[in-house]
Each structure stands twice: as C-alpha cells, then as structure tokens.
Amino acid sequence: MNFNKIFVFVALILAISLGNSEAGWLRKLGKKIERIGQHTRDASIQVLGIAQQAANVAATARG
C-alpha cells in the first residue's frame, strides 16, 4: 500500500517537471516559427517595393 502512494507521488513530480520542460521547448519552437514568419513578411514587403519601383520605371520609359 505504501508503495502505491510513493509511486503516485514520484509520478506526479515527474509529470510536473516534464510538463514545465515541454512548455519551454514548445515556446522555443513557437518563437522560431514566429521569427521565420517575420522574415518572410519583411522579404515580401521589400519585393513588393522593388516590383512597384520597376513598374514605375517601365511606365515612365513607355511615356
């Protein structure tokens, strides 16, 4: 009977400690994905600006 109580206590401690470490790991992964999204957004904004300038130059060259 005492073994069951000890086992439950140890399992509870392990679950709490693993739960905290998993949250940290998921947070790091989420931040990496967020950073990739920010870089993609910034790159697309730059490309749109360059394409708009090229369209303006082409329109000016046509007259």
Curated annotation (Swiss-Prot):
Protein induction: Induced as part of the humoral response to a bacterial invasion. Transcripts appear within one hour after injection of bacteria into the hemocoel, reach a maximum after 2-6 hours and have almost disappeared after 24 hours. Similar response is seen when flies ingest bacteria present in their food.
Transmembrane parts of this sequence: none
Matching InterPro entries: Cecropin, Cecropin_insect
Effect annotated for changing V10L: In strain: B141, M2, M40 and MJ2
Alphabetic keyword roster: Amidation, Antibiotic, Antimicrobial, Immunity, Innate immunity, Secreted, Signal
Single Gene Ontology BP annotation: innate immune response
Leader peptide range in chain numbering: 1-23
Family note: Belongs to the cecropin family.
Protein name: Cecropin-B
Species, as recorded: Drosophila melanogaster (Fruit fly)
